[in-house]
Amino acid sequence: MAPKAEKKPAEKKPAEEKKAEKTPKAGKKLPKESGSSGADKKKKKSKKSIETYKIYIFKVLKQVHPDIGISSKSMGIMNSFINDIFEKLAQESSRLARINKKPTITSREIQTAVRLVLPGELAKHAVSEGTKAVTKFTSS
């Protein structure tokens, strides 16, 4: 283990020297740096992807009503609605797992959470669709 400790300070010293060399140059902008910053601007354009349900909402809308569109404001509302329902189901299934002293959330906890969170007929349809999806997933 002692040789590893000796190698690390040896690696840090040249890096520190390089940093010391780079700091005075940081004030100056060389033509090479300005050219590379143009490439950096292109990289900055690609923002961090935000996960939304917008694509899936649109696909379901087209399955149900092919001739109807949706505004971006309405899409945002639907997206936040789905996020809210997802969060409620996750909290409820987590609570159920904790009550039953189970370390994992299984499909049973999810199904019970759906029955508790969603009202009446909606819960029945959600459970049947969920069961169908789980069966399809396990069979393939």
Swiss-Prot record:
Top-rank lineage group of the source organism: Eukaryota
Classification via InterPro entries: Histone-fold, Histone_H2A/H2B/H3, Histone_H2B, HISTONE_H2B_site
Pfam families linked to this entry: Histone (PF00125)
A single GO cellular-component term on record: nucleus
PTM: Can be acetylated to form H2BK6ac, H2BK33ac and H2BK34ac. Monoubiquitinated to form H2BK143ub1; may give a specific tag for epigenetic transcriptional activation.
Its biological purpose: Core component of nucleosome. Nucleosomes wrap and compact DNA into chromatin, limiting DNA accessibility to the cellular machineries which require DNA as a template. Histones thereby play a central role in transcription regulation, DNA repair, DNA replication and chromosomal stability. DNA accessibility is regulated via a complex set of post-translational modifications of histones, also called histone code, and nucleosome remodeling.
Protein name: Histone H2B.2
